Amino acid sequence: MAIHDDRMKAMLFEGPSQIPVSVGILPAAWRLHREKLNDVAAKYPSLFGPENRDRDFDAVGGTYVAGEHIDAWGCVWSNLCTGMESIVTGHPVPTRDDVRTLKAPEKDVGTPHGFMFLRLTDLRGFEEMMIDFAEEPPELQMLLDIVRDYNVRQVSNMLPGLIGAEPRIVYFGDDLG
């Protein structure tokens, strides 16, 4: 409960006992440094979570596996090296006309990091999305509405699982830099 209390205090600027942070390590780093990295993580459980001496250093899944992956929206993710982060190299909505026929996925895949801004750039490509933001064509609002409605559906699906005795914090990761 102390971690939750510190998070609430930090969000409300009420002087938490610690600044709440978490550290994520790429699978490639675990694969390379193995037990040495596990020793570092064990030394700092407040940053890395509980000690895990049974870690499978070679277990890599999803878009961390080298190759091309297509997500529920039709974005093509490319990864050159297993364990590293992949990047979107194929944007399924390259033109404004394509926005007019875009349908959100029927499949519910949750709320990945890149909840709104990154999803928009994944769909359109960074340059095209920046032009859309600058010019504000009608297709921009159409795209925003499609992604927003999908995200609302994902959050609605998640809410029943958050009801319980312990207070929960829900956050949505995104990135503009």
Which sequence ranges carry the predicted segments?
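Catalytic cores of TIM-barrel enzymes
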Residues: 1-177
